[in-house]
């Protein structure tokens, strides 16, 4: 029998539960029991089922995810249940309960469900927050294995970045056209400028612990590379200082011989003053002093800054030595260069009536251009009273010259001449071997320096021509910068005139025109703009125009004011005349 649709006594018919006239079978009962154990799909998809109260056969008592609107009501359902009994206190709180401590729960009950809506929360850095900039070791990127720290804990150290290893190499200089110039090409090159500045700095060094003034020399600075006192072969302990003359302001070398009270022969001093050669350090004067609390003899020589000795450069393992490897040798061309310079220096000394006297690598100064100078030529002549004959000392100079070249070629000073000759024979050319053997051999023959130069003239030709090439290079460098002094003079005149005439003063009309031309000239030099009204900064054009102004050529130029209302056509010669005239009037006024 069917049931009416709106009958309240029966449930509303659905698609899943329909009334049937037949009685339920065993299979239907099993299916119904299985459906009761299955969670409703609407609960999984939508969180609720609208047919749960109207005959849905599936289970609806499982956990579900409530919406954000019902979450708050669900969370306080147990606390705010209207069906629960009202709160009835047993008795009033005692008076002592007012001073009781505040209740702090041990744990807080967490909500069983999570809301789908994301609420932004302001995070405050806690005590366990990680600061990436606090750990310096995290800033160092080391992709390679460090063998030195295998068995040790890594230290928290910060190391600066080596930019020379990480930055790429600069691009090569582009090829310039014949009419193009660079800013560095307008001035002295950096290598020459740095060499000159280093020499100037070395000439101004002073040490306050030394005497402030000795005779007419001040600003003493020690030049000895060793900290202990050493005795020269002349028999006296000596020190070497750099000093400045209060008479001419030039730097000199002051050589002090301790406890040397020997009388000086004035005639020998005058002869030594006249010894002047490019490869010999000039001697100037000698006098006694008690400034160092003893009887010291002071010898004055010329000062050559930024120089070292051949012994320090090639034979000692010092910081300035370049010959530290046993198998490394000096090029033969360089040895011929030293050979040639020493030979002509000794030849000049012998013709002047003196000998070099005990030539050693420590007495030979060398600079960055491989130019050598023999120092201390006056020491032996003035201090030693019982000297051997001059001819005997000249012959000893020949042997000393050969020994010096042999020491440089082998890199050793403790090798006997026979072993040194074999080493030179196996390393250098036969001609160089014969040249060294000519001086170190004990054959009793008269050695002649002029004859030696004639026999080896072919090897000396490249050495003789190299100074001319270097001189030509230096002249080119100077020619590029020598006019800068005149340019500076012109700029000073322009700035003096402009700065002195900024105040409102009354001038004659003719002078006002000349001053206005100077202002226009200043704008013509430093206030050029292109067609896009952008400033033109061209150093070469400024130097070119200053050169034309200094020469006073007849080339006409147009001087235009900044507002482009005034324009004057004038030549460089007229501008130079007006500039000199106004500057002279400024001086006289």
Swiss-Prot record:
UniProt lineage: Eukaryota, Fungi, Dikarya, Ascomycota, Taphrinomycotina
Name of the encoding gene: ppk26
Binding site for ATP: 255, 302-309
Chain intervals for the UniProt region annotation (Disordered): 1-32
Protein's UniProt name: PAN2-PAN3 deadenylation complex subunit pan3
Coiled-coil segments on the chain, per record: 458-496
Localization of this protein: Cytoplasm; Nucleus
HAMAP family, per the entry: PAN3
One BP annotation, GO: mRNA processing
Organism from which the protein derives: Schizosaccharomyces pombe (strain 972 / ATCC 24843)
Region of interest called Pseudokinase domain, as start-end residue ranges on this chain: 201-457
């Amino acid at each position: 029998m069917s049931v009416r649709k709106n009958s309240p006594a029966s449930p509303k018919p659905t698609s899943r539960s329909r009334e049937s006239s037949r009685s339920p079978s065993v299979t239907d009962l099993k299916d119904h029991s299985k459906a009761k154990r299955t969670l409703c799909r609407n609960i999984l998809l939508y969180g609720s089922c609208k047919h749960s109260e109207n005959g849905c056969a599936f289970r609806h008592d499982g956990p579900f995810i409530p919406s954000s609107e019902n979450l708050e009501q669900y969370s306080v359902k147990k606390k705010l249940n209207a069906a629960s009994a009202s709160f009835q206190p047993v008795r009033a709180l005692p008076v002592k309960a007012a001073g009781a401590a505040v209740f702090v729960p041990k744990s807080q009950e967490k909500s069983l469900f999570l809301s789908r809506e994301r609420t932004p929360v302001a995070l405050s850095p806690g005590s366990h927050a990680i600061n990436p900039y606090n750990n310096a070791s995290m800033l160092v990127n080391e992709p390679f294995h460090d063998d030195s720290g295998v068995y040790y804990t890594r230290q928290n150290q910060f190391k600066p970045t080596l930019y020379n290893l990480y930055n790429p190499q600069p691009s090569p200089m582009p090829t310039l056209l014949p009419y193009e110039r660079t800013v560095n090409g307008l001035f002295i090159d950096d290598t020459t400028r740095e060499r000159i500045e280093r020499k100037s700095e070395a000439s101004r060094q002073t040490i306050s612990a030394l005497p402030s003034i000795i005779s007419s020399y001040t600003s003493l600075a020690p030049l000895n590379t060793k900290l202990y006192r050493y005795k020269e072969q002349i028999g006296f302990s000596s020190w070497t200082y750099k000093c400045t003359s209060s008479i001419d302001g030039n730097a000199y070398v002051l050589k002090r011989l301790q406890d040397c009270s020997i009388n000086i022969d004035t005639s020998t001093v005058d002869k030594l003053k006249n010894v002047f050669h490019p490869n010999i350090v000039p001697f100037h004067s000698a006098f006694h002093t008690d400034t160092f609390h003893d009887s010291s003899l002071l010898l004055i020589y010329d000062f050559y800054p930024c120089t070292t000795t051949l012994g320090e450069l090639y034979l000692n393992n010092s910081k300035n030595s370049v010959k530290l490897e046993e198998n490394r040798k000096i090029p033969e061309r360089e040895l011929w260069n030293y050979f040639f310079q020493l030979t002509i220096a000794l030849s000049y000394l012998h013709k002047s009536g003196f000998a070099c006297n005990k030539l050693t690598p420590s007495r030979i100064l060398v600079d960055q251009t491989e130019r050598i100078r023999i120092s201390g030529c006056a020491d032996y002549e003035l201090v030693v009273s019982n000297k051997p004959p001059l001819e005997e000392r000249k012959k000893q100079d020949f042997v000393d010259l050969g020994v010096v070249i042999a020491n440089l070629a082998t890199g050793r000073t403790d090798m006997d001449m026979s072993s040194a000759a074999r080493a030179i024979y196996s390393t250098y050319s036969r001609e160089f071997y014969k040249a060294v053997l000519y001086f170190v051999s004990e054959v009793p023959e008269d050695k002649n320096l002029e004859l030696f130069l004639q026999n080896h003239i072919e090897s000396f030709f490249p050495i003789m021509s190299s100074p001319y090439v270097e001189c030509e290079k230096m002249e080119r460098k100077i020619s590029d910068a020598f006019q800068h002094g005149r340019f500076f003079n012109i700029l000073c005149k322009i700035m003096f005139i402009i700065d002195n005439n900024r105040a409102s003063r009354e001038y004659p009309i003719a002078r006002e025109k000349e001053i206005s031309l100077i202002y226009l000239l200043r704008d013509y030099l430093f206030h050029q703009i292109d067609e896009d009204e952008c400033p033109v900064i061209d150093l070469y054009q400024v130097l070119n125009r200053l050169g034309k102004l200094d020469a006073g050529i007849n080339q006409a130029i147009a001087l235009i004011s900044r507002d482009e209302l005034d324009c004057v056509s004038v030549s460089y010669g007229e501008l130079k005349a007006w500039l000199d005239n106004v500057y002279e009037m400024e001086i006289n006024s």
